[in-house]
């Protein structure tokens, strides 16, 4: 028989992969917006809450959309992610901003009236 394989040195386990959705120390970077400051702040706060609460981009987008539908009347659309393109039609109100590595595009399209 050949020599025994060498045992690997034991040390602390490697750190877990970064969960880029978590909102720790995220600063909002506004790219474009037609919203009032108050509405923009609501979008950022809803996004931070969604990033803390959920683990997928779709869940975060759903959280933001539902908050805006309930607060500012339907119909809002939301896209959340690190890499996407868009070409949209909107009704006067939209915002596009980053929280850390995550981009958020939120816009109103249509109404419930």
Segments predicted by a language model, with ranges:
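Charged, amphipathic alpha-helical regulatory modules used
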Residues: 2-113
